[in-house]
Regions:
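Secretory-pathway/membrane protein signature
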Residues: 10-11, 15, 39, 68, ...
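Buried hydrophobic packing segments
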Residues: 33, 121-131, 192, 246-249, ...
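Acidic/histidine-rich catalytic neighborhood of metal-dependent amide-processing enzymes
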Residues: 108, 118-142, 161, 165-217, ...
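Acidic/His- and Gly-rich active-site-bordering loop/insert found
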Residues: 1-114, 147-148, 163
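Short glycine-rich anion-binding loops that position phosphate/pyrophosphate groups of nucleotides
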Residues: 77-81, 181, 369-370
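Metal-dependent amide/peptide-bond hydrolase catalytic core
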Residues: 4, 153-156, 208, 213-215, ...
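Intrinsic disorder/low-complexity segments
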Residues: 58-68, 133-170
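Hydrophobic/aromatic beta-strand patches that form the interior of the parallel beta-sheet core
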Residues: 72-74, 176, 202-204, 363-365
C-alpha cells in the first residue's frame, strides 16, 4: 500500500510544483488540493487558503473511537518563496531529463516548493489517507491487520507497519495545510490558530528535516538600528559622525553575552548584516542605519532581547516583528518519548516555521533536506517521500 500512496503523493507533488504558489498567492494551488482531496473522498473545510481535515470526521470512521483521546495536528504549508534567477531548469515545469542530469539522480521531484514544503504536504496527505482507509487505524469495520511492507534499506524507521485496531488508536488527527508561512502572513497559521487551538493537544510541523525530529527551533528577531549624529563639513571637522556612533554600538552589540544558555540550542546568536550611511565624501553623516539579525532561544522573549540591547547602545532600535519566537518540545512529552522509542534522531533547528505560531507541544519533522530550501534547483528524492509516509504512520501508530 505504501508504494501506491507514494506514487499518488509524487503525482500530486508534480502537479503542485506546476502551480505558482508564492506567499499571499496560494488560491490556485489551494483550490487544486481541495479538488484532489474531494476526489479522494476526504471530508475537509477550507478557511481562506488553509485546508483542515479531521480523522474522526471522515466517512466510515467511528468517532467514538477517539472519545477521551488527545488530538495530534499534522501541519505543512502550501506556499513557496520566489524562485532563484539561477535555476538550471524551469522551476515550475522542469525538464525532468535535464533536472536529473543537473542533480545526478532520476529518483527526484524537481522544482520550486518540491522540498519546502510540498514533500511534507503530500506525505502528510498520504498518511491521512492511509489512516482513513480500510487498512487504517480507525475504520468502523476493524479490518484484519495489514502489513505496509518493508522499509527501504538505509531509510530508517520500522521494517513492518501494522495498523492498530480502532481501540488501539492513541490520538485523533487534524491535518492542516496552511498558507502564508514563508512571509509570516496573518491569514495563515497566525490567524488560523485562534480558531483551532482548543482542539489540539500536540503537533508535528512538516518541514524538510530528513525525517529527524527537531525538538527545538530558534526564533528570528530582525532589528533596524539608527544612529543619529549631526551633519557638518568634513574639511572643518564639524558635526557628530553617525558612522562612529554606529560602529561603537556594533562593537558593543556583537560582543554582548546573553547570560541564559539554552540546554538544547546554546547561546542567542547575533550578527550585524547590513549598514548604510553618507550622502557625499565631504559631508559628515547625521544618520547611519544598520540591521541586526538575531536567532533567539527559548530562554528569552524577543521583547526581553530588544530591551536588553537598547539599554547598552545609543542607536535607536526598532524590531520588525516580535512574534517570531523560538520553540522547544516539552521535556518527556509524548512526542519526545515516541521519537526516542522509535530511534528517530533529534536535533535543534536553526530555521523558523509555523511552530512559532502555535502554543501547544510540538516537534518539527518532514521529508527533504533544509539545505535545499530557498535555493536554485530545488528538489526532493522520491525515496524521501516514501520514507516520510512510513515514518509518519509509524509515529502515529506508536505515539505514547
Amino acid at each position: 500500500m505504501i508504494k501506491a500512496l507514494t506514487n499518488d503523493a509524487v503525482s500530486l507533488l508534480k502537479d503542485m510544483v506546476a502551480i505558482p504558489s508564492l506567499s499571499f498567492n496560494e488560491d490556485q494551488v489551494c483550490s487544486f488540493i481541495c479538488k484532489w482531496m474531494d476526489e479522494k473522498g476526504l471530508a475537509f473545510r477550507r478557511v481562506g487558503n488553509n485546508i483542515i481535515a479531521r480523522l474522526s470526521e471522515q466517512a466510515g470512521i467511528d468517532p467514538k473511537a477517539f472519545e477521551g483521546k488527545p488530538t495530534l495536528m499534522l501541519c505543512a504549508h502550501i506556499d513557496t518563496v520566489s524562485p532563484s534567477n539561477e535555476y538550471s531548469f524551469d522551476p515550475y515545469n522542469p525538464d525532468y531529463a535535464k533536472a536529473a542530469e543537473v542533480i545526478g539522480s532520476e529518483d527526484i521531484v524537481p522544482g520550486l516548493g518540491s522540498n519546502d514544503d510540498g514533500a511534507s504536504v503530500v506525505s502528510m496527505l498520504a498518511t491521512f489517507i492511509y489512516l482513513t482507509s480500510s487498512s487504517g487505524a480507525g475504520f468502523k469495520n476493524n479490518p484484519s491487520q495489514a502489513s505496509l511492507g518493508p522499509s527501504p534499506c538505509g531509510q530508517g524507521g520500522s521494517t513492518v507497519f501494522k495498523p492498530s485496531s480502532t481501540a488501539a488508536v492513541n490520538a485523533d488527527i487534524i491535518l492542516v495545510l496552511s498558507c502564508e508561512e514563508e512571509r509570516s502572513g496573518v491569514n495563515g497559521m497566525t490567524g488560523l490558530w485562534h480558531e483551532i487551538k482548543d482542539e489540539i493537544d500536540f503537533a508535528i510541523i512538516g518541514e524538510p528535516t530528513l525525517m529527524k525530529a527537531a525538538t527545538a527551533e530558534r526564533g528570528l528577531l530582525v532589528i533596524d538600528a539608527t544612529a543619529h549624529g549631526v551633519s557638518g563639513h568634513a574639511a572643518r571637522n564639524e558635526g557628530v559622525n553617525a558612522i562612529e556612533i554606529a560602529l561603537k554600538d556594533i562593537t558593543t552589540l556583537t560582543s554582548h553575552e546573553f547570560d541564559r544558555i539554552s540546554p538544547r540550542m546554546g547561546k542567542v546568536n547575533l550578527n550585524v548584516t547590513q549598514i548604510n550611511a553618507g550622502t557625499a565624501h565631504n559631508v559628515i553623516p547625521d544618520k547611519c542605519t544598520f540591521v541586526i539579525d538575531i536567532r533567539p532561544t527559548e530562554q528569552y522573549t524577543n521583547e526581553e532581547i530588544l530591551a536588553q540591547l537598547q539599554s547598552i547602545c545609543k542607536s535607536e532600535l526598532k524590531a520588525r516583528n516580535l512574534s517570531n519566537r523560538s520553540s522547544a518540545t516539552v521535556t518527556d512529552s509524548p512526542l519526545q518519548k515516541t521519537a526516542e522509542a522509535l530511534g528517530i534522531e533529534t536535533f535543534s533547528s536553526p530555521t523558523t516555521s509555523d511552530w512559532m505560531r502555535i502554543d501547544c507541544d510540538a516537534i518539527k519533522m518532514g521529508p527533504g533536506d533544509s539545505s535545499r530550501s530557498h535555493k536554485k534547483d530545488e528538489f526532493v528524492y522520491i525515496h524521501e517521500i516514501e520514507n516520510g509516509i512510513r515514518t509518519y504512520i509509524d509515529f502515529i501508530n506508536n505515539i505514547l
